[in-house]
UniProtKB/Swiss-Prot annotation:
The keyword NAD applies. This is NAD(P)H-quinone oxidoreductase subunit 2. Its EC number is 7.1.1.-. The keyword Secreted does not apply.
Length: 520
């Protein structure tokens, strides 16, 4: 094989955005090695510039004529582009909120950013991976980096405990997922590319076998861990409470987006012959997530634990689009994850600012905050109200789109359950808003009474302010001006071949038993 044919099969230009992230990662390490601690003033901006360049590269790859690279191991279609963009953008905002936080914790900023970029790289590769080895390596890159980030503040016992729990539960879920993947490899006759696995299973007529069912259950268990879906959510509250706040901000968006990207690609490509079965399993997960997440969040006293259970509930809402299995369903998932990126990171930015100034994340300590810090109060209020689905904020339109897609697909009772649990979530979101805004001066918490003077010119606070303002504007405006995001989500689904061919494959598979019965 000559070099030209090899280059054509590799088509490495498809992973140009990931290449830019790799170069940025190496640049961060080299600059830190040469300049040491003096580089911390601007090394975060170097990483942000690299990530923004990767997002620009993704933009120019939209509707690529040949999105397949590495002989089918990676597909840079529009679906992967939108998810890779979400992950990269979440990393940008995370770096903005991390600079002051990491410096104040006494740890090295360059190493933190390097690990974060590695996690971003893993998530971006997961979003387009179409081959078992590529999926597993990408997933492990994301997972191991996440474990390291969770325990990054080594002097904090809570961070160490969270990292250990995350590692143990994550390793178990990885083993379960890997066993399910190995069953797929065997059932398909030794295939590793996703479409070849589906064809091999259909040809061998083992789609309804016990092995295929076990593989499906194990794969869903691995995905459920990544998206924090109940009952695979046990790690979420403890990790959210103990890990550095910028880390959980990234995990709540970047890791979740990677998990849903993997779910769409893996389930629709490999399991079209048991679509009803995996939709039934995800229906159970969605019901558990929406009920457990919203009900348990009512009793939380820590803001981070409350958002942990909120994250579990949000995963349940997004699963409605996956269960619908229609173009509108997949597009609604993408749209909701886009707006979830802004409203969730806006909330975490406010929590970081409050914890940096007060040293606590207890909900009761936010009492009367409006009188001392109006901008932070506004940002957190808009974020929480949007998460609750209050119009005309972005979260309202995201939920309407999800529920409408589910209703059109006939998921009437699941949509009604989503509406009821959304009302429950509004209670604990508004409780925090009311505490910050409505309290009288004499009801102000002791922490807020001693609230330090607001000084944005301190080192690392300006990026936090920029992150807060940008996410606040996006959360407020994305709802009113949602049409461009709707169009983007719809186009990403309509232009993705696997989501269109899946309908044909599932129709053909469902017709096989009928043809056999007619022959008999």
């Amino acid at each position: 094989m000559d070099f030209a044919n090899l280059a054509a099969q590799l088509n490495a230009g498809t992973i140009l955005p990931e290449g830019i992230v790799i170069v940025t990662l190496m640049g961060v390490l080299i600059v830190d090695l040469i300049l040491g601690r003096t580089s911390s003033r601007w090394i975060g901006y170097l990483a942000i510039a690299g990530l923004l360049a990767a997002i620009v590269a993704l933009y120019f790859q939209w509707d690529a004529t040949n999105p397949i690279s590495f002989t089918g191991g990676f597909i840079g279609d529009d679906l992967s582009i939108i998810f890779r963009g979400i992950i990269a953008l979440s990393a940008v905002v995370t770096i903005l909120m991390s600079i002051r936080y990491v410096e104040q914790s006494g740890t090295a900023l360059a190493e933190f950013i390097a690990i974060l970029l590695t996690a971003t790289l893993g998530g971006m590769f997961v979003s387009g991976a179409s081959e078992l080895v590529m999926i597993f390596i990408s997933l492990e890159t994301l997972s191991i980096s996440s474990y390291l980030l969770t325990g990054y503040t080594k002097r904090d016992p809570r961070s160490n405990e969270a990292a250990l729990k995350y590692l143990l539960i994550g390793a178990s879920s990885t083993a379960v997922f890997l066993y399910g993947v190995s069953l797929l490899y065997g059932l398909s006759g030794g295939q590793t590319e996703l479409s070849a696995i589906a064809n091999g299973i259909i040809t061998a007529n083992v789609g309804q076998s016990l092995g295929a069912v076990i593989a499906l259950v194990f794969v869903i268990a691995g995905i459920g861990f990544k998206i924090s879906a109940a009952p695979f959510h046990q790690w979420t509250p403890d990790v959210y409470e103990g890990a550095p706040t910028p880390v959980i901000a990234f995990l709540s968006v970047g890791s979740k987006a990677a998990g849903f990207a993997l779910a769409i690609r893996l389930l629709t490509t490999v399991f079209p012959f048991v679509a009803e079965e995996w939709k039934f399993v995800f229906t159970a997960l969605a019901v558990l997530s929406m009920i457990l997440g919203n009900v348990v969040a009512l009793a939380q006293t820590s803001m981070k634990r409350m958002l942990a259970y909120s994250s579990i509930a949000q995963a349940g809402f997004v699963m409605i689009g996956l269960i619908a299995g229609t173009d509108a369903g997949y597009a609604s998932m993408i749209f909701y994850l886009l707006v979830y990126l802004f409203m969730n990171l806006c909330g975490f930015t406010c929590i970081i600012l409050f914890s940096l100034r007060t040293g606590t994340d207890q909900i009761a300590e936010y009492s009367g905050l409006y009188q001392k810090d109006p901008l932070l109060t506004l940002g957190l209020s808009i974020s929480l109200l949007s998460l609750g689905g209050i119009p005309p904020l972005a979260g309202f339109f995201g939920k309407i789109y999800l529920f409408w897609a589910g209703w059109q697909a006939g998921l009437y009772w699941l949509v009604l359950l989503g509406l009821v649990t959304s009302v429950v979530s509004i209670y604990y979101y508004i409780r925090v808003v009311k505490m910050m805004v409505v309290k009288e001066p004499q009801e102000m918490s002791d922490v807020v009474k001693n609230y330090p003077e607001i000084r944005w010119n301190l080192p690392g606070f300006r990026p936090l302010q920029v992150g807060l303002v940008l996410t606040l504007i996006a959360t407020s405006v994305a709802g009113i001006l949602s049409n461009p995001l709707f169009t983007l989500a719809n186009n990403s689904v309509a232009n993705t071949a696997i989501l269109q061919t899946t309908k044909v494959v599932s129709t053909q598979v469902s017709a096989i038993p009928a043809e056999k019965s007619e022959g008999l």
